[in-house]
Amino acid sequence: MDNSTIESSIGQIRKRNGKVDSFNMDKITNAIYRALAATSKADRGLAEELAQGVVSKLMTQGFSASRQPSVEDIQDMVESTLIENGHSEIAKAYILYRHERRKVRDEKMKVLNTQTLDPVAKHFDLNCLRVLASRYLLRNNKNEITESPSQMFERVAILIAIGDLLYDSTLFTKDGNSKQNTDEAHSYLEKLDSFDYKFKIGDYYLNKYHFRSLINHYITLANKGQMKVGFKDLLTKIAAKQFDNYAEKISEYYELMVSQDFLPNSPTMMNAGGRLGQLSACFVLDMPDDMAGIMKSTSDAALIFKSGGGVGINYSDLRQEGDIVASTSGVASGPVSFMNIINTVTEVVKQGGKR
């Protein structure tokens, strides 16, 4: 019996999260092969033979397309098949492998504060998930994680695709001669909550912050005379699924990030499709040579750090240490003293935030 016939006979399996997935005999073969490799007996042919034995036991015990085995059922069958075929050493390696996998799985769920792992969490190693949990995954006001890694990458991918959508040839013109009234678009900013997950591109729903980004992008382009349609007409077109082809873009961006072939900068991961919406990583600020300007730059730097951005500051306008300050008849403390102030402020903000 070939693999395709076997797989169709079993049909599906029940995963730990309760979902049903297609039965794949290669996964059993690969698990056994890893156990063989752990005992320095890496033999693909033997792994395939033992996997066939596991499937035979499953079918003998009545598992079929109408009675799906669970992941645990299959793993128990692997252990018993190895022992029954005289491979006790390999069975021990498999049991240890299974135990280690369970430990990693439990630790991942603890890090993400969840009872189940999505496909991305299963694929990413523990250190990656620790970084995502500490810096990038959204949290509520109780500091509890509120999204999975898959949801985070989807949130980012949707926002990136919104920019592409507005440059669609049916919406965008380069000549700048298309006049649209943006008052209507502005009015939607006052009722964002009413549009949370109301519109979607393909199967991807826009949350209220995606919707806000759509409005702001539209207003920017409309003010340049580059939007061919009014904002209400744009929403009508989205609702009519005229731009569902951009779901492919969302999926493409998503897969690039999940595969780690490409990752955007930190603020984009933190804020895309979120409340702050600040995507830029680097800012340059001037430091004017007066106290009000110095404090304003200090405040701006703190707010940028709070949103996940980084700051470079031009101190060249500040007078050197010891110069006379006419307004107070005192002397200037110099750029280094204000560098220390900025450093202290941003360190405090960094420790309490994501930067």
Describe the function of each predicted region:
Residues 1-355:
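Extended catalytic cores of very large enzyme megasubunits
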